[in-house]
Design a protein with these regions (language model features):
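Short, cysteine-centered beta-strand-loop-beta hairpins and adjacent loop/turn segments enriched
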Residues: 93-101
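Beta-strand-connecting loop/turn residues
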Residues: 33, 82, 116-117
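Short, low-complexity N-terminal intrinsically disordered segments enriched in polar/charged residues
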Residues: 1-33, 51, 132-135
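C-terminal-biased regions
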Residues: 3-4, 64, 70, 84, ...
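Short beta-strand edge/turn micro-motifs at domain boundaries
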Residues: 102-134
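Hydrophobic/aromatic beta-strand elements that line small-molecule binding cavities or substrate pockets
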Residues: 15, 56, 72-77, 89-92, ...
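A solvent-exposed, acidic/Ser-Thr-rich amphipathic alpha-helical stretch
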Residues: 24-79, 89, 101-102
Length: 135
């Protein structure tokens, strides 16, 4: 019998690994086209995966944005029927024209079941960790 919590964690790990490797295509493949994104680093809601892809491409082109590493801790999965809420603390190293930045943030990714044992993300929310020291 499938373990939905393990499946969600595997889907989250795939997404986090792709982001940490700056693997744009694999990262965005984790999200449905209708996914929404709320980041403390952007002024408004990114109302689709395409909107986040365009913002990613802009950051790469204009600021030399590149993810160097991403680590997930304090992980939690809440299952509500065919939906799962994954929350964690995420430590990210990235670089841009401003130099290397280490971010300490809290993130929630909401998944929905897509097939018998597959989960796809349809919402991501990122906020600074309250006890973070950002450099």
């Amino acid at each position: 019998m499938p373990d939905p919590t393990a499946e969600v964690l595997a889907a989250a790990d795939q997404c986090i690994a792709a982001f940490g490797a700056h693997d744009r295509d694999a990262y965005f493949a984790c999200f449905s086209p209708d996914a929404t994104f709320i980041f403390h680093t952007t002024p408004g809601v990114l109302a689709s995966r395409a909107a986040w892809e365009a913002e990613w491409d802009r950051l790469v082109a204009e600021q030399g944005f590149r993810v160097l590493a991403c680590t997930s801790t304090d992980r939690r999965v809440q299952l509500v029927g065919e939906v799962a809420v994954f929350s964690h603390r995420v430590l990210t190293r990235s670089t841009s024209t401003d130099g290397v930045v280490e971010s300490d943030e809290r993130e929630t990714i909401v998944f929905r079941r897509s097939g018998e044992t597959t989960w796809i993300a349809f919402h991501e929310h990122l906020s600074p960790s309250p006890d973070a020291t950002l450099s």
